[in-house]
A protein has these predicted regions:
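Conserved nucleotide-sugar donor-binding subdomain of glycosyltransferases
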Residues: 1-83, 135-138
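Short N-terminal targeting/anchoring amphipathic segment
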Residues: 77-93, 104-110
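Conserved donor-binding/catalytic core segment of Leloir-type glycosyltransferases
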Residues: 194-227, 238-240
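A short, basic/aromatic alpha-helical/loop segment that forms part
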Residues: 187, 213-218, 228-231, 246-247
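Carbohydrate-associated surface elements
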Residues: 163, 184
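A short, histidine- and acid-enriched strand-loop-helix "catalytic/donor-clamping" loop
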Residues: 109-139, 155-156, 186
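Short, structured helix-loop element that forms part of the nucleotide-activated donor/catalytic region
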Residues: 231, 238-253
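Membrane-proximal helix-turn-helix segments that form the acceptor-binding/catalytic region
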Residues: 73-82, 117, 134-157
């Protein structure tokens, strides 16, 4: 049946008729827990396993797939109020919810990405200790799948700069939907700033205003600056921003 085929397409990371999937999860009789523990999902996972991952332990694979799809399936069980416009500030689960709302209510969907969700999740998963080996790739595929859905269904997708736009297109967003909306800066507000005494020298001052956290990859910036300083000794780096979000990382920096 078409619902089974749709779920298999999701798990196999193939082109998916998401309308069929959204309709499935809005049927009263569908229980997420029963679906994940039932024979249909078991057979779908087994088929995926036999085709793509026959060299790993099946029981581990089965429970991982249940864990991966539990939050996604629960999101799709949610009721979304009718609106003229839905605005998602990321792809991921938010993008799934926005896409589902558009499916049921026929409204417009705007996605405005600050960071690129798929790339950020990929970086986190690569570094994560709680997921190993091939399972990292499986999680990353699921994140890409959700973002692709959001890009496909959105009417407009914005980002902050051209490189982010290129990433969105690379991840499947149609170029005609993308727009760069940079953070606004009024230079006149900074014209009369007082220069600190420690900056009144012949150094070339470079500033970074950010949260000192792993997602900002401050360590790489420091290493890059060290390389640059060898080439240009007059450089001086200032890192400005909160350090309390990940104090251990801040100390390492």
């Amino acid at each position: 049946k078409k619902e089974y085929a749709g779920l298999l397409d999701i798990v196999m990371n193939r082109k998916t008729d998401w309308g069929v999937i959204f309709d499935l999860f809005h049927k009263e009789r569908v229980s997420v827990d029963k679906l994940l523990m039932g024979p249909d999902f078991f057979e779908i996972v087994r088929e995926c396993y036999n085709r793509k991952y026959p060299n790993i332990v099946f029981s581990d694979f089965l429970w991982t797939m249940r864990s991966i799809y539990l939050p996604l399936f629960r999101i799709m069980k949610m009721d979304v109020p009718k609106a003229d416009l839905y605005h998602c500030v990321a792809t991921g689960y938010a993008g799934v919810l926005g896409s589902m709302a558009k499916h049921f209510h026929g409204s417009s969907l705007l996605i405005s990405e600050h960071g690129i969700y798929t790339r950020e999740r990929e970086e986190e998963l690569i570094k994560a200790d709680w997921v190993k080996g091939v399972y990292k790739n499986i999680w990353i595929e699921r994140c890409k799948k959700m973002s692709f859905l959001a890009y496909e269904k959105a009417d407009i997708v914005t980002c902050l700069y051209e490189r982010a736009k290129s990433l969105q297109i690379e991840l499947g967003c149609p170029e005609e939907k993308t727009q760069v909306t940079p953070n606004g800066v009024d230079p006149s507000r900074f014209e009369n700033l007082v220069v600190l005494p420690q900056m009144q020298d012949d150094k070339v001052h470079v500033g970074a205003i950010l949260r000192v956290t792993p997602i900002k990859d401050v360590k790489t910036m420091i290493r890059a600056f060290a390389y640059a300083k060898k080439k240009a000794p007059s450089l001086k780096l200032w890192i400005m921003g909160p350090t309390d979000e990940d104090e251990e990382y801040a100390k390492e920096c």
